[in-house]
């Protein structure tokens, strides 16, 4: 079930790229397979699959950003339900970032947008639990780079330099 979940996840949009109709169709197919195979999945896995199912309904004409907001709400709820899962918290934070790509801070107030404040809180929780979590450090840099105080992510950048395998080019370039 989780292999199919991953297929759906990989076809979804992210902060750097939208998704084509073909990717949407592939994600819909994949999430249906994940649902079909989920009987023996863990509770966390079932929550992840349910969130992806909400993200990729059969209706190709559905408002993509509204679906992303629904997906994010389900992911944040799951992260609160299973606070022991750092990976789930990181995925939930990423889902919140996808609802407002590269527009994380209100320029009038210098405050994080509400869903981004949630993402920051989730990522900071993961970093406190597992400072070497590479995706938590990666996302924290992105969350803070346009904040009023980007130096808040300096320690995360230092950890990426020290711990990211050189083959992970995007992560290795992040601290620069």
Regions found by a protein language model. Give the residues of each.
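Short coil/linker segments at helix-helix boundaries
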Residues: 4-84, 91-128, 132, 137-167, ...
């Amino acid at each position: 079930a989780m292999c199919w979940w991953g297929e759906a996840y990989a076809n979804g949009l992210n902060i750097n790229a939208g998704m084509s109709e073909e990717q949407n169709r592939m994600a819909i197919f994949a999430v249906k397979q994940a649902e079909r195979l989920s009987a023996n999945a863990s509770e966390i896995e079932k929550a992840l699959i349910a969130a992806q199912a909400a993200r990729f309904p059969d209706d190709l004409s559905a408002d993509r950003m509204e679906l992303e907001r629904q997906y994010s709400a389900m992911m944040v709820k799951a992260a609160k339900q299973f606070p022991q899962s750092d990976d789930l918290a990181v995925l939930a934070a990423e889902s919140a970032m996808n609802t407002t790509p590269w527009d994380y801070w209100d320029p009038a107030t210098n405050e994080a947008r509400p869903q981004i404040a949630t993402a920051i809180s989730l990522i900071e929780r993961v970093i406190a639990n597992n400072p070497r979590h590479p995706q938590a450090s990666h996302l924290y840099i992105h969350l803070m780079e346009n904040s009023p105080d980007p130096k808040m992510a300096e320690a995360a950048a230092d950890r990426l330099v020290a711990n990211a395998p050189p083959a992970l080019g995007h992560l290795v370039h992040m601290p620069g």
